[in-house]
Amino acid sequence: MYTITKGPSKLVAQRRTGPTQQQVESRLGELLKCRHSAPTPQHPRAQPPGPWPLSSPGPRLVFNRVNGRRPPATSPSLEGTQEPYTLAHEENVRFVSEAWQQVEQQLGGGPAGESGPRPVQYVERTPNPRLQNFVPIDLDEWWAQQFLARITSCS
């Protein structure tokens, strides 16, 4: 049998806190002022369809506290350190690296007279016409350009 508790549950009783409407409006005013005073880019690109323009950051993630507890404080020295790799991880990386080098050698000609199965490189017989004008983009370069544009537009 189920029992019904009196009063609201802890989940319902917790209130949401966030910036006040005045803080939101002042921040919006600052961003709009910064955008209107920004110079136009030399190479204008079409904006992809979506809820945010390219120059604005994506939505901010907000994590709520569990049971009203604060998250454990992290020291700044721990944030910059890398996670230590396990021996199994290093062994897997070494195995994949050696296997890939072996495949590259066999594709490049490799030792002559070696019998047995060789790797086969996939070549598409009927290329997709939509991909005829496809140009790959360097994401690191693109993000660097966006970062520099943001810095120059707000300074």
Curated annotation (Swiss-Prot):
Biased composition annotated in UniProt, kind: Pro residues: 46-56
Positions of modified residues (Omega-N-methylarginine): R35, R60
Modified sites of kind N-acetylmethionine: M1
GO cellular component: cytoplasm; cytoplasmic stress granule; nucleus
Source organism superkingdom: Eukaryota
Modified residues (Phosphoserine): S56, S77
Subcellular localization: Cytoplasm, Stress granule; Nucleus
This protein's record includes keyword DNA-binding: no
Intrachain S-S bonds: none
Quaternary structure annotation from Swiss-Prot or TrEMBL: Interacts with DDX6. Interacts with MCRIP1.
Family statement: Belongs to the MCRIP family.
Name by which UniProt lists this protein: MAPK regulated corepressor interacting protein 2
Annotated organism of origin: Bos taurus
Source taxonomy: Eukaryota, Metazoa, Chordata, Craniata, Vertebrata
